[in-house]
């Protein structure tokens, strides 16, 4: 499952997530793309109803997105860099996923991260670290982009369709997430 945290449809982040999903599909995984920027989602209001009921009190598209995450064996989560971190759209998903963590519904699912920025060292690693932290808190298994790079994940710069390193690290990540998810399922 690819999750695009960008508010822009068909932008640089979506391009790399799609490349990763294509590689995951080539490795044998069933693939699906979710665009948070196109979803009707609200931020967490800290009402704590999820603590009592196990479900979020807000009725919006997040419910369906979280259900898809529970059914998926692996995730590729992408975000553009916004002030060294993830977008508000992706942060809402993280905050609203509390009901999943309560029962560790993402435990042992495989996850990887992609970040795009305006320059090669434009905050991609800190953005990826935020996604990794989310996955670790959910007790998911975090993977990087694998051999030959063996770094944090997909890192894109500018016009990602022309960024060979960004394309390669994202494809490597997609393949790696799929291979491990298939082995574990």
Question: What is each of the regions a protein language model found here?
Answer:
Residues 1-29:
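N-terminal beta1-alpha1 ligand-phosphate binding loop
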Residues 5, 26, 64, 137-185:
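Glycine-rich phosphate/pyrophosphate-binding loop and the adjoining helix
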Residues 7-8, 38, 118-119:
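Short, glycine/serine-rich, charged loops/turns that create anion-binding
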Residues 32-35, 144:
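A structural preference for short, hydrophobic beta-strand core positions in alpha/beta folds
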Residues 36-56, 154-159:
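N-terminal beta-loop-helix "entrance" segment that forms/cooperates
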Residues 53-147:
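Helix-loop-strand module that forms the ligand-binding subsite of alpha/beta enzymes
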């Amino acid at each position: 499952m690819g999750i695009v945290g960008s508010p822009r449809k068909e932008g640089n982040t979506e391009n790399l997530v799609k490349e990763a999903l294509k590689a995951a599909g080539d490795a044998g995984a069933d693939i699906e793309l979710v665009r948070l920027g196109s979803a009707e989602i609200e931020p967490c209001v800290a009402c704590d109803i999820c603590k009592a009921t196990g479900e979020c009190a807000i009725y919006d598209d997040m419910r369906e997105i979280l259900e898809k995450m529970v059914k998926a064996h692996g995730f590729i989560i992408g975000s553009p860099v916004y002030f060294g971190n993830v977008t508000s759209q992706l942060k809402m998903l993280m905050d609203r996923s509390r009901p999943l963590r309560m029962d560790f519904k993402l435990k042992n699912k495989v996850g990887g991260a992609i970040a795009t920025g305006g320059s090669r060292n434009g905050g991609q690693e800190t953005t990826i670290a935020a996604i990794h932290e989310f996955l670790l808190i959910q007790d998911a298994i975090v993977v990087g982009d694998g051999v030959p790079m063996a770094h944090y994940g997909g890192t894109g710069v500018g016009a990602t369709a022309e960024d060979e390193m960004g394309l390669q690290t994202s494809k490597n990540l997609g393949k790696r997430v799929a291979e491990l998810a298939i082995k574990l399922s």
